[in-house]
Each structure stands twice: as C-alpha cells, then as structure tokens.
Amino acid sequence: MRAELCADLEEALRAGGHEVVRIERACFDIFVRTRDGRAYIVKVLINADGLRREVAEELRRISHFLEAVPVVVALKRHTGPLEKGVVYHRYEVPVLDPLTFARLVEGEPPKAVADRGGQYVVIRADEVDELDVSRVRRRQLRREGGRITLARAEEADVEGVPVELKTPEHVDTGRDRMTRFERRVAELLERMGAERTGKVRRAPFKLLAKDGETVLARAEEGGDRESIALRDVASATGSMGVIVTRERCKDTYVPTIDIGTLEEIKDLEDLKEYLQERDPEERVRRLVEEAGITSPREIAQRTGIRESVIREFLRRMGITDERKV
C-alpha cells in the first residue's frame, strides 16, 4: 500500500509539471522541485507514527543542506485519518495528508496546525476584532498571536493566516558519525571553502557540504542504483555530485575523484571545474553531439566508460539505437 501511495504521488507531481526524483532504500522517498523553484524532501508513510526519531533527524539534516522543506505524507496516525488542510508534526517534521501536500505544491498552503487540545489557526488582528467575544478575550487573543481553534474560525467565517513550512535552520550535522575517511574528505571540503559539512546514513550520498555550492558526496564506491540516484538528486538541486575513493576506481554514473587528487585541489570552484571536465554523461553527450556517435561500443572504446553506463545516458538522451544523429 505504501508503494502504491508513493507511485500515485509521484505520478501526480510529474503530471503537474514538477521535477521529481524517486529514491529507493533511503530515509526519503521523493525529492520535488516545484515549477516555481520550491524544494521538498518527502517521506511517504501510511501511518505517520511510523516515523522514527533518527529518520526525522536525517530528513531535517538533508533539507537543511539542500535548502528544502522536509515533509511526511501519510494517511493516518494513532488518533485516526489525517484531516485535510491541517499540518501535524512528528519530531519537528511537518506531516500532511496527500491532498494537502498536493495543494501545498501548487501554491495553496494549509491554514491549520494540530496541537495539544485540537486544531488551531492564526487569524489577523482585524479578524480578531470581528470575533463575537469580550474585550478581555480579544486582548488575550492578541497576546497569543491570534490563535484560535479551527472550529471557532469556521464558526466565525475567518480564514486564518497560511501556515509557513520552512527549511530547518538548526540541525545536528551528524559529523560525530563520520568514518575516519569521511572525516578526511569533510576536512578537505572545508579547507576548500565549505562552511558546513554533515553526514547522513540513509541516502544515496553520505556527505554534504555547503557554501554557495552544495556538494553531495559519497566517500566510497556503491552500486549503479545508488550512483544514478546521487546523480539525479545533484542535478535536481543544482549541486555537485561526486564519489571520493581511496584509489582510482572504475567509471560510474557520477564523477569520481581519488583522495590524493582531492588533496591537490585548492577550492570548491576548482573542484567544480574538475568534476565538469570528467563528468561521464557530458563526455558521452559531447561525442553524440559533436561526432554523431551513438554506438555504446564505440563510445566505450573512446572514453573507457562501461557500455551499461553509456546505454543509460543514451536512454536519457532519447537515443535507443545506434544510428547516427
């Protein structure tokens, strides 16, 4: 059922013209870049109570570095089905039902927040004056920021102020969970100019660095599925995706660099230039566009890139055979 909910959500987002990256075996399921540039890190659950604290921390950490909003999309929690138009929270992560999230993505934010004692909305000062309550109660409401129950707002026919979902500002970066090799990579990125570095466990990337340019890195080789996911997230977020290895490694879907070469690079701008020059997809694209070559075997002979990797790049370019372009 969760897989079906993921698939339905992904289909609806793509149909709406938003950029979507589907992730498997990670702390989040979907990355969304809306048409107007807003970014969301989405975890899909049937029951929101299934969100564990450590997963919530990773959602917040990734969102912090990628300047995104973490969201859990679920159908219910222990008290019953999630109400439409209401924001719930679990471990500081907003929880929405699918329809409310779909409306949020389309620019219609929710207006109620679930809290102890019920569901509340915040109304404007002029709306407070319109309520049929005593002067004492009006003064109290102003002191409380105009927060009233959703039922009272509906009774008074006031809409309330939209709930703003924000990118987490203060998070545990997870540096204490880095391996020795990951810590060395993080130190080099900081020397190059990154102000912040962090570590996540359940994602196609394990290291994050931020200072103008966001770096998504993995200090180890991984499978093709992880590499494709790393590349897709980096592309959707405008980040640098890179795999850092102890020694030179086989080609992959993402630019790679060995630790010795990384130590010689001066700053993040030089790193970006280095990765762009060695980006395997760009190398394939240049051969297709400049030389008209679409044969995976011939491209492999010229570049040393694996044929399976080349076929995936050609598929993304809409080329399914070996004809000349």
Swiss-Prot record:
GO terms for molecular function: DNA binding; DNA-binding transcription factor activity. InterPro entries: Arc_TR_HTH. The keyword Ligase does not apply. Residues 128-190 form the HTH cro/C1-type domain. Keywords: DNA-binding, Transcription, Transcription regulation. The keyword DNA-binding applies. Residues 139-158 bind DNA. This is Putative HTH-type transcriptional regulatory protein MK1005.
